[in-house]
Amino acid sequence: MRKYYYWILLLLFLILSIYIKLIGGEQNIGFNVELFKLINYNQIATLNGLMVFLSKYGREYVWIPVTALLLIFKRTRKIGITLVISFVIAIVLGEVSKYVMAQLRPFNFVNPTYLLEPKPTDYSYPSGHALIVSTGAVTLLLTSPKWMWILGIIEAVLVSYSRVYVGVHWPLDVIAGWLLGSWISFLSVQIESTGPIKKIEQMLKA
């Protein structure tokens, strides 16, 4: 069954990416612009600090320690190794996708945009934050106990939402990040279970 999810996720990401390219950019998709405004224009002052914190620190400051902790213990090392594989693939494919797609961020088109952090200078699509946190969360979903992946999913959703909330990403950037990240998670689980990676695991357990 996982093989079907694998191909569906990749296909959806590719279809969305091609569509965005064909129409000349995310700014030309009406619901994408309106959903951005709905989220960004309805900021709640008491939540701004939390959203900025999640946007700035919800990626590296959560997933690096989580991965390191899982690698330390033999019982969870397999999960940690799968996360490492996932993140390496996500970083590479994420950067390649950004430069292939070359999509500008919403503050270049939507006026006003209520920015809560400095303007990023790189491209927008897909969201690197959404890509990494979704990769981590879905990898946990596929490999770890229920309590662990539930926490991962909650954290990933909040971080992804925060990127639109603070004004630095289109909603479709986040959706694309989740599609690509989820596909990478399925791929990484397959990679971990076969070939040289399995031999490395066995050596570490010895």
From Swiss-Prot:
GO cellular component, one term: plasma membrane
Bilayer topology term: Multi-pass membrane protein
Alphabetical list of Pfam families matching this protein: PAP2
Induction entry: By polar lipids.
Residue ranges of the TM segments: 5-25, 53-73, 79-99, 138-158, 164-184
Annotated SMART domains: acidPPc (SM00014)
Record-linked InterPro entries: P_Acid_Pase_2/haloperoxi_sf (IPR036938), P_Acid_Pase_2/haloperoxidase (IPR000326)
GO terms for MF: sphingosine-1-phosphate phosphatase activity; undecaprenyl-diphosphatase activity
Cross-referenced PANTHER family: AT30094P, SPHINGOSINE-1-PHOSPHATE PHOSPHOHYDROLASE
Protein name as annotated: Undecaprenyl-diphosphatase
UniProt source species: Sulfolobus acidocaldarius (strain ATCC 33909 / DSM 639 / JCM 8929 / NBRC 15157 / NCIMB 11770)
